[in-house]
């Protein structure tokens, strides 16, 4: 046990000595890097380089560097190497700083800053272009065996408010290590370039690098300040509409199918929106899907137009633009009744309405009884008159007595006697 205790004490002592050697001396003095430079290596791209201070005291420690971007947009990060690439706009100038740091779990030691700067290019800010917008679009490449798809680039801008009339602008783009100048421009009424078209580029439709665009200019009267801008491809990529959209109606079921757009992305990388418009009542239905088929229950007595659009799903890249709607497809029956049939229906309805009004008037004013009085029923009592006339002449011709006799059956009205 005594031997074991001695061994443990020896190991513990060795561990403490080793930790003491590894811990940085808080009294160590850190010196800033030297020869800090900023070099433009491409459109909207700079290389920061520096060297360790040769007077820095060497210890068994790992020194790091903290880089701070001051302009045009603040940022900071740490690195262990002595150079750093930075993609940023440069028309406003660029400045950065770097310092030596040494950190552990308890504290951070840092040197003073070493700084460098790129000044803004010459020219009045009002001479540079404004409202630069760019879009990309993917098409099938039938001319290259290396790439199945080709990306085009289209950019537009407005002339600077203080730019002289003889100003001419020129556009360049950089993607990765490729830089290209525009050859196809559109011009305004003064002949100044205001748009550019690249039918074929080195841009990768599935790429994630920044697209850098620079527009500079020239004039005989003043210096034109250049303008550069960075674009994320997912934010400017104009997706093509879906292909081969079909729609069929079976009873009250509307079945819609389509194919994925022309794109380097596979079929599972798309979201879709289906728009179904009832042309009779104006009802609009929009459904979002992840498949290339949709079934809807509809009114089979109406006519519909169907359209579909697409967007790259967030599963494959950051959310971007929706495509344009596909060309409308019309399905269904929207035949109207013939004019003659409608005319007959209207006439019959009018006649029924008039008769109803007349009937109400007659009922209210008792005209019906006055116009068409009821016919009395024939009586059931029949009078049988039996008349017997007896002439009796009593001797004398001067006096004549006429007697009329009758027999009345039960229920027969009594007639008055007439004596002549």
UniProtKB/Swiss-Prot annotation:
The chain crosses the membrane at residues 343-362. The WSXWS motif appears to be necessary for proper protein folding and thereby efficient intracellular transport and cell-surface receptor binding. InterPro entries: FN3_dom, FN3_sf, Ig-like_fold, Short_hematopoietin_rcpt_2_CS, TypeI_recpt_CBD. Residues 1-20 form the signal peptide. Pfam families: IL6Ra-bind. Glycans are attached at residues 35, 131, 216, 244. Expressed on eosinophils and basophils. It comes from Homo sapiens. This is Interleukin-5 receptor subunit alpha. Keywords: Disulfide bond, Glycoprotein, Membrane, Receptor, Repeat, Signal, Transmembrane, Transmembrane helix. PANTHER family: CYTOKINE RECEPTOR, ERYTHROPOIETIN RECEPTOR.
């Amino acid at each position: 046990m005594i031997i074991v205790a001695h061994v443990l004490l020896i190991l513990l002592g060795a561990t403490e000595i080793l930790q003491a050697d590894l811990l940085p001396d808080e009294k160590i003095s850190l010196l800033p890097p030297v020869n800090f430079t900023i070099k433009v290596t491409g459109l909207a791209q700079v290389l920061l380089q520096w060297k360790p201070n040769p007077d820095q005291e060497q210890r068994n420690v790992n020194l790091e560097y903290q880089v701070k971007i001051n302009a045009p947009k603040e940022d900071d990060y740490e690195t262990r190497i002595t150079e750093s690439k930075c993609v940023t706009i440069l028309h406003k100038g660029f400045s950065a700083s770097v310092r030596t740091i040494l950190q552990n779990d308890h504290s951070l030691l840092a040197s003073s800053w070493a700084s460098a700067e790129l000044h803004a290019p010459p020219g009045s800010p009002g001479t540079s272009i404004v409202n630069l917008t760019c879009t990309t679009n993917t098409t099938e490449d039938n001319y290259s065996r290396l790439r199945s798809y080709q990306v085009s680039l289209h950019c537009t801008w407005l002339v600077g408010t203080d730019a002289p009339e003889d100003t001419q602008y020129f556009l360049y783009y950089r993607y990765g290590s490729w830089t290209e100048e525009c050859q196809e421009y559109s011009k305004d009424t003064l002949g100044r370039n205001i748009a550019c078209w690249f039918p074929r580029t080195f841009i990768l439709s599935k790429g994630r690098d920044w697209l850098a665009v620079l527009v500079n200019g020239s004039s005989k009267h003043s210096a034109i300040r250049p303008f550069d801008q960075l674009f994320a491809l997912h934010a400017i990529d104009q997706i093509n509409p879906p292909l081969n959209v079909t729609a069929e109606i079976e009873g009250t079921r509307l079945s819609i199918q389509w194919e994925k757009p022309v794109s380097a992305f596979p079929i599972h990388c798309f979201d879709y929106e289906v728009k179904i418009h009832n042309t009779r009542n104006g009802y609009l239905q929009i459904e979002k899907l992840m498949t290339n088929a949709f079934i809807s229950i509809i009114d089979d007595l109406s006519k519909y137009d169907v359209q579909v659009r697409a967007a790259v799903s967030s599963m494959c890249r950051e959310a971007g633009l929706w495509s344009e709607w596909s060309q409308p497809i019309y399905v269904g029956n929207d035949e109207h009744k013939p004019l003659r049939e409608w005319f007959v229906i209207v006439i019959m309805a009018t006649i029924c309405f008039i008769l109803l009004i007349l009937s109400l008037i007659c009922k209210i004013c008792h005209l019906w009884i006055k116009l068409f009085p009821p016919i009395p029923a024939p009586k059931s009592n029949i009078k049988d008159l039996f008349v017997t006339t007896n002439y009796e002449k009593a001797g004398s011709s001067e006096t004549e007595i006429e007697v009329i006799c009758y027999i009345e059956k039960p229920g027969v009205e009594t007639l008055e006697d007439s004596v002549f």
